Amino acid sequence: MNSTVAPASVADIRKIFLDFFASKGHTVVPSSPLVPGNDPTLMFTNSGMVQFKDVFLGTDKRSYVRAASVQACLRAGGKHNDLENVGYTARHHTFFEMLGNWSFGDYFKRDSLKWGWELLTKVYKLPADKLWATVYIDDDEAYNIWTQEIGLPPERVVRIGDNKGAKYASDNFWMMADTGPCGPCSEIFYDHGPAIAGGPPGSPEQDGDRYIEIWNHVFMQYDMQPDGSVKPLPAPCVDTGMGLERLAAILQHVHSNYEIDIFDALIKAAARETGCTDLGNKSLRVIADHIRATAFLVSDGVLPSNEGRGYVQRRIIRRAIRHGYKLGQKAPFFYKLVPDLVTLMGEAYPGLATQAERIAQVLQAEEERFFETLANGMQILDETLTGDAKVLPGDVAFKLHDTFGFPLDLSADVCRERGVEVDEAGFHAAMEKQKAQGRAAGKFRMDRALEYSGDGNDFVGYERLTEVTKIVALYADSTPVSELKAGQAGVVVLAATPFYGESGGQVGDQGAIFSDGAMFDVADTQKIKADVFGHHGVLKSGALKIGDVVTAHVNASLRAATQRNHSATHLMHKALREVLGAHVQQKGSLVNAERTRFDFAHNAPVTDEQIREVEARVNSEILSNAATQSRVMDIDAAQETGAMMLFGEKYGESVRVLDIGASRELCGGTHVARTGDIGLFKVVAESGVASGVRRIEAVTGQNALSYLQDLEDTVTQVAGTLKAPVVEINERVAGVLDHLKSLEKEIAALKGKLASAQGDELVTQAVDVKGIKVLVAMLEGADTKTLRDTMDKLKDKLKSAVIVLAAVEGDKVQIAAGVTSNSVGKVKAGELVNFVASQVGGKGGGKPDMAMAGGTEPAKLPAALASVMAWVSAKL
């Protein structure tokens, strides 16, 4: 492995590490998923050795005995939980990358330590006088290798004893478990210098930041016995791990991991999306760290949920959102960082790039969900923590968790910033109390936000949209009140109501509640209990009191549009079962005035032909104009009619059976009187939302007509551009594409001729430098292929040469570097192209004899090209 200059980027550090160990006979192994496939006891992959655990235990064998990898790791749950420190220290992260090399019964201490020293001092070029090492107190072999063979001064090799209270309980003795493979380890430290507080390893001041551990070499040479004794292993192994971010901080001459190139870019992206101008703000650090963790988790199949790994994911996402909110961002922003992350890490982790769109969708959905309650939750925190409060009560922390979706550690994060502790015992007691109440209730959990003990409402919304009725309860800020005044937001409960409360996927009605001098705008209707509807809105004028007689009026146009979509959903469900199969089951739905969104069980995308068939069946039912019928009957009788029942849904003794066309389902929603009232049905989107779950979105009535008219406008515009009748668009487009292909072939042929001609002309411009021809040139109008073709011809003609060719197209720079085979021992094309690209805002890579790069600063290209001669001369 040749020496090289200190790498300028995290990407360089990764590549150099893997290349180095590949040159030492190691097999480069890809990073394993963050969800361990071989260890159900481990929540997340937290080190490079996880994927090799079975090899060390002897239950698995590999085709190689030496391995190296760059492993994606996560520490944010369970035993290894750094979440509360992330963003507040220089080196704590949720997601991090671990550089590692392993020997499975092959080489041992001597090669491991010597290669480590070679890589750090000869390749990465760390100053040898800045490095320290620790060894286990009894490990004379490792100590002698450091002091006698490598030449590290004895005063910088520290023996660490059993500093944890028992034999082999030491920072420098590693055990996989209470019994089994174990052994001493040797850690390499970097000294940041006397300007930073802290003492050397093993000293009382070792916890400072001056001496930082960068690489741990574990030597598994013993088998720990149940009695605490050790026996030699027949085939000792090596397991090493080096934090990429820590190493990058040293190589890039910064003290904090958050100052390295990859975090610098993510912090700037977070600042862009939050509007924060202080790049040193710790909240930006949190966001930059968390986008890595959450994106990689989604990439590995971990979606936000309320349990297990999914809840860790939710906690991390919501912590990032809260820090964005703290910076003044009141709308979803976090998902917008995904493209930045893909740019930085997509090449090293291809799965990140291929799933970028899905990752952004998952994060955006979680953001939208949390932003609905974040402001209210923060208001409660602010009110509770006013004055000289020293503790956040456990019941308040639980309310934030249960009602507003605040994970406990998010509330603790806010409290820590204000010097306040959280009563965690009280929190857990409140949670256990709720669980006990839920077990006792056994059936229906009531809305905890509004306490109502009166009679149920009389729902008249199936028959009419207006009802004269009486106010029986009023609420403001979730608290019962006797009166609402103008300007107040609140909830109104009526003795009878035509408003439908959100249920079964259908949104709640909107409208107005009014009396002489009072007008209450109803923005939403939600169930407080199964038979009690709360009308949520704002009192625009006058006053409302309990006992007032009022008129309740539903917005008729919104109700009608919602009914069309709901009835169409039933017809679509029936059609999907007929077209795709009886396995189709509803998994979720949302029906409002704009569209219907229907999630269902199905393991493959619905084809265009299948969608057309579903549309045809639904529209056929609409054209039949069949009357809708509803009947209330007991559950057993409903089952005998063959009515479709949703799997997992809880039904009472009496149910409402709804017949719409050929569909028969149990449903309490509102529907059209006849199928013809739907007007028209059109599917507008089909997608996957989870493993085995598909989603169809559709529109009806006027919305369907508008959608088709928009499509027609687009088709008409395309026809106009092509100067062809609409019916001939396909034929005309095919002709244009054929003509385009023909032109592309002609252009390619011309470029080939141009490359040949330019090659002949450029040969005369080559300069002899120490016996090797060096050629640097700009090619006008060339693309990447032309650069490559010209490069190949020049290498053939010049025989022994180093060549750099460049071209500019708009604001983009393309650079090619080529080295003939007899010169690659002195000059590497990859190093050369990166040298040039780094001066024009870009980077690249390739093989030793041919490499390509791009850039974004064409104005700097002439100076960059002018510097090539001196660079090459220094290498020769």
Curated annotation (Swiss-Prot):
Cofactor note: Binds 1 zinc ion per subunit.
Keyword Protein biosynthesis: yes
SUPFAM superfamilies reported for this sequence: Class II aaRS and biotin synthetases, Putative anticodon-binding domain of alanyl-tRNA synthetase (AlaRS), ThrRS/AlaRS common domain, Translation proteins
Keywords: Aminoacyl-tRNA synthetase, ATP-binding, Cytoplasm, Ligase, Metal-binding, Nucleotide-binding, Protein biosynthesis, RNA-binding, tRNA-binding, Zinc
Record's GO cellular component terms: cytosol
Signal peptide segment: none
Catalytic activity: tRNA(Ala) + L-alanine + ATP = L-alanyl-tRNA(Ala) + AMP + diphosphate
Coiled-coil stretches: none
Molecular function as annotated in GO: alanine-tRNA ligase activity; aminoacyl-tRNA deacylase activity; ATP binding; tRNA binding; zinc ion binding
Record-linked PANTHER family: ALANINE--TRNA LIGASE, CYTOPLASMIC, ALANYL-TRNA SYNTHETASE
Domain notes: Consists of three domains; the N-terminal catalytic domain, the editing domain and the C-terminal C-Ala domain. The editing domain removes incorrectly charged amino acids, while the C-Ala domain, along with tRNA(Ala), serves as a bridge to cooperatively bring together the editing and aminoacylation centers thus stimulating deacylation of misacylated tRNAs.
UniProt family annotation: Belongs to the class-II aminoacyl-tRNA synthetase family.
Matches recorded under NCBIfam families: alaS (TIGR00344)
Matching HAMAP family: Ala_tRNA_synth_B
Protein name: Alanine--tRNA ligase
Gene that specifies this protein: alaS
